[in-house]
UniProtKB/Swiss-Prot annotation:
Role of this protein: Located at the top of the head of the 30S subunit, it contacts several helices of the 16S rRNA. In the 70S ribosome it contacts the 23S rRNA (bridge B1a) and protein L5 of the 50S subunit (bridge B1b), connecting the 2 subunits; these bridges are implicated in subunit movement.
Assigned keywords, A-Z: Ribonucleoprotein, Ribosomal protein, RNA-binding, rRNA-binding
Name the record gives this protein: Small ribosomal subunit protein uS13
Subunit structure: Part of the 30S ribosomal subunit. Forms a loose heterodimer with protein S19. Forms two bridges to the 50S subunit in the 70S ribosome.
Taxonomic source organism: Pyrococcus abyssi (strain GE5 / Orsay)
GO cellular component: cytosol; small ribosomal subunit
Chain's gene name: rps13
């Protein structure tokens, strides 16, 4: 076995070496537990091993799979951006690229004046929730007591 490292750097994120590999990978934004388990299986690694025992070659293999998971055999339904709006490819975005893509999607909806974009603009719920009692913003007004 390789030397144990308490912090392992994968895809620009520090992972806890004491956790199981599949749980450690969930620290990367855009990678959930199911996707992390798939990445481990495709890379030929035990998802239950401690992340601190990863070698540099194994880290590189994981990073390659995270860059293009569909090409490495992960199914299309598992990626977080199927049929990308601009390219039409099945992508799986992680970390800053994921944040940027979400921000660009919201800006596109606002620019074309779609209903969802207008709701985002106004700071209202976007997915059909009711607004009578929830989603109130700002400071609450307390109840004043009567003077005796």
């Amino acid at each position: 076995m390789a030397d144990f490292r308490h912090i392992v750097r994968v895809a620009g994120v520090d992972l806890d070496g004491n956790k199981q590999l599949r749980w450690a990978l969930t620290a990367i934004k855009g990678v959930g537990i199911n996707f992390a388990t798939m990445v481990c299986r495709v890379a030929g690694l035990d998802p239950f091993m401690k992340a601190g025992y990863l070698t540099d070659e194994q880290v590189k293999k994981i990073e390659e799979i995270l860059q293009d998971p569909v090409a490495h055999g992960i199914p299309r339904w598992a990626v977080n951006r199927p049929k990308d709006y601009e390219t039409g490819r099945d992508l799986h975005l992680i970390t800053a690229k994921l944040d940027m893509a979400i921000r660009e999607d919201i800006m596109r909806l606002r620019r074309i004046r779609a209903y969802r974009g207008i709701r985002h603009e106004l700071g209202l719920p976007v997915r059909g929730q009711r607004t009578r009692s929830n989603f109130r913003r700002g400071q609450t007004v307390g109840v004043s007591r009567k003077k005796k």
